[in-house]
């Protein structure tokens, strides 16, 4: 069997090597992202145009028909009666 000390040394060396590779990769990635942000121009949003005027809808009435009011009132009364039981 091999010595446990040599296994720990090998494990530590592998860990440090892996952490070093990740550190170098992330450093290069940050450098490239900063370089790209300087080279590529920012997007300019399209100019805001004035909204189109909405035509006045005179055809529609703003009142509710009495049948609709009666139906809604009956439904509310029925619901309240069923909840109260």
From Swiss-Prot:
Highest rank taxon of the organism: Bacteria
Catalytic activity: oxaloacetate + 2 Na(+)(in) + H(+) = pyruvate + 2 Na(+)(out) + CO2
Cofactor list: Na(+)
Entry membrane topology: Single-pass membrane protein
Record's keyword annotation contains Transmembrane helix: yes
Enzyme class: translocase
GO MF, one example: sodium ion transmembrane transporter activity
Catalytic activity, EC: 7.2.4.2
Origin species: Vibrio vulnificus (strain YJ016)
Subunit relationships: Heterotrimer of an alpha, a beta and a gamma subunit.
Main function: Catalyzes the decarboxylation of oxaloacetate coupled to Na(+) translocation.
Record InterPro entries: Na_pump_deCOase (IPR005899), OadG (IPR023424)
Gene encoding the protein: oadG
Keyword list, A-Z: Cell membrane, Ion transport, Membrane, Sodium, Sodium transport, Translocase, Transmembrane, Transmembrane helix, Transport
Transmembrane residue ranges: 11-33
Annotated localization: Cell membrane
UniProt-recorded name of the protein: Probable oxaloacetate decarboxylase gamma chain
Gene Ontology terms describing biological process: sodium ion export across plasma membrane
Pfam families hit by this protein: OAD_gamma (PF04277)
GO CC, any one term: plasma membrane
Main location: membrane
Entry's family note: Belongs to the OadG family.
């Amino acid at each position: 069997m091999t010595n446990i000390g040599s296994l720990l040394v090998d494990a530590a060396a592998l860990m440090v090597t892996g952490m070093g590779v990740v550190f170098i990769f992330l450093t290069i990635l940050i450098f490239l992202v900063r370089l790209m942000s300087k080279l590529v121009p920012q997007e300019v949003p399209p100019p805001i145009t004035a909204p189109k005027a909405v035509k006045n809808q005179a055809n529609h009435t703003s009142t509710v028909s009495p049948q609709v009011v009666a139906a809604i009132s009956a439904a509310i009364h029925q619901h309240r009666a069923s909840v109260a039981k």
